[in-house]
Curated annotation (Swiss-Prot):
Record-given protein name: Pregnancy-associated glycoprotein 63J
Tissues showing expression: Expressed in chorionic epithelium (trophectoderm).
Any single GO CC term annotated in Swiss-Prot or TrEMBL for this entry: extracellular region
Root EC class: hydrolase
Amino acid sequence: RGSXLTILPLRNISD
């Protein structure tokens, strides 16, 4: 279910 897709934007916002 969007493994990456969800982790990609999530990490960007965390930074």
